[in-house]
Structures are given as C-alpha cells and as structure tokens.
Design a protein with these regions (language model features):
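General nucleic-acid-binding
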Residues: 1-44
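Short, Lys/Arg-rich amphipathic alpha-helical interaction segments
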Residues: 83-84, 88-121
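Short, Lys/Arg-enriched anionic-surface-contact patches
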Residues: 43-64
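Short, flexible helical or helix-coil boundary motifs
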Residues: 33-36, 40, 57, 104, ...
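Short amphipathic helical patch at the helix-1/turn junction of helix-turn-helix
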Residues: 71-73
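Residues within the helices of the helix-turn-helix
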Residues: 79
Length: 121
C-alpha cells in the first residue's frame, strides 16, 4: 500500500500545495521535447509555447513573492526562509522583501496589486 505524501499543517490538516511542481514541469518538458523531435511542434507552435511559459514563469514568481510576504506576516524568520532561496544566509530573502516593500506592505496589498495588473491586460 502506497503512503500518502500529502503535506500536513501543524494542525494535521492537508496543506495547500503549489499548483505546479518541478517534477510536473520536467514531465511536460519530456513530452514537449519528444513532440518537437518528431515534428509535431513547428517553430510557430514553439514560439507560442515560449510565450505561455514566460507568462507562467511570471505568475510563479508573483506567487513566490506573495508566499514570502505571507510567511513573514505569519512569523517566519529570514533564517527560516533562507534555505528555500537556495542560500544559507538571509541576504537573498531580505533583499527580495526590501524590493517588495517599495510597492506593497503586506501580502494582501500584493494580491490586490496582482488583481489590478491582471485587470489591465
């Protein structure tokens, strides 16, 4: 019997997961590469995919910024956050927070900013 690997919160409830994972992207990339090799995807289709991926990348970066703000608001220290930035020191998340705080002061303000930007498209 396979174990359920769904993350749980401190209360024991299932934890919210990111909408896409690195494994999901790799699986998709393998399929896309095979389609490109076999000629199923021509240059215009690949350019369209490139545009979609760049938009998705921006959306993921925005979600990451929101999560950073929300984690700090929930009491996480920069030392706790630093490892997810791939660094053992706090400069990376601190610099990102400093940049974000030039535009917004909270995760809720950030979410509202994203809503406004999406409405302007």
């Amino acid at each position: 019997m396979a174990e359920d690997s769904t993350p749980v919160s401190a209360t024991g409830e299932p934890s919210l997961r990111a909408p896409v994972t690195a494994a999901d992207v790799l699986e998709w990339l393998e399929q896309a590469a095979e389609a490109a090799r076999s000629g199923e995807l021509d240059a215009p289709a690949l350019i369209d995919l490139l545009g979609q991926l760049r938009q998705a990348s921006t959306a993921c970066a925005n979600a990451s910024d929101w999560a950073l703000l929300a984690a700090r608001e929930a009491g996480a220290s920069l030392r706790q956050i630093a490892p997810v930035f791939g660094k053992g020191y706090v400069r990376a998340p601190a610099a990102r927070l400093e940049k974000l705080h030039r535009e917004v002061l909270s995760s809720e303000q950030f979410l509202e900013l994203m809503r406004r930007r999406m409405g302007n498209r």
